[in-house]
Amino acid sequence: MKKFQSMMAVVLVALMAFAVQSCGSDDDNNQQYKLTVTLDITDKGPLTDAQCDAMRSDAQKGSTVADHPTDASAETATMRAAQAISEALVLYKDTYGSAKFTYTLVCTKVSGNKQIITYYVEYNAGSINTYNNKNAK
C-alpha cells in the first residue's frame, strides 16, 4: 500500500504540473486560467479493460469547445488533464487494481467573466458516472 501511495503521489505531482502548464494562459485574449485537479483512488479490486475503455471515452468527451468558443484553452486543458488522469488510472489498474475512485477537474478563468468548468468522474462497484458542468458567472 505504501508503494501504491507513493506512486500515486508522484503521478499526481506530474499531473498537476501538466495541468497547470496546459491551463496557464490563453494568448488569444490574454485570459489567465487556474486548473485544480483532485484525485481519490481506493484500492478495492481490478477494473476490467472495458471499464477502463469506457472511462477513457468519457474523459475524451469532456471538451465541448463549441459551447464556449472563447474559452477553448480552458476546455482543451480540462480535456487533456482528464485524459492524462484516465491514463494514470489505467496504469493503476494494471499495477494494483482499483474498484472505486473519483476525480474532479476545475478550470476557472481568473480575469474577465468567470467561467468555471468542472469535469467529474466517479467509478464505484461496476458503474461509471460522469458529469461535465459549466457555470458562467
Explain the meaning of each model-derived region.
Residues 1-22:
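Sec-dependent bacterial lipoprotein signal peptides
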Residues 16-40:
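Bacterial Sec-dependent N-terminal signal peptides
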Residues 35-39, 103-107, 119-121:
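Hydrophobic beta-strand residues in large extracellular and virion-surface proteins
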Residues 39-43, 109-111, 125:
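Beta-strand elements of well-folded, non-transmembrane domains
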Residues 41-83:
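Post-signal-peptide N-terminal segment of Sec-exported extracytoplasmic proteins
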Residues 74-98:
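A short, charged, amphipathic alpha-helix used as a generic interaction element across diverse proteins
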Residues 96-114:
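A short amphipathic beta-strand at an alpha->beta junction
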Residues 121-137:
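Short, low-complexity, Pro/Ser/Thr/Gly-rich segments in the mature regions of secreted, periplasmic
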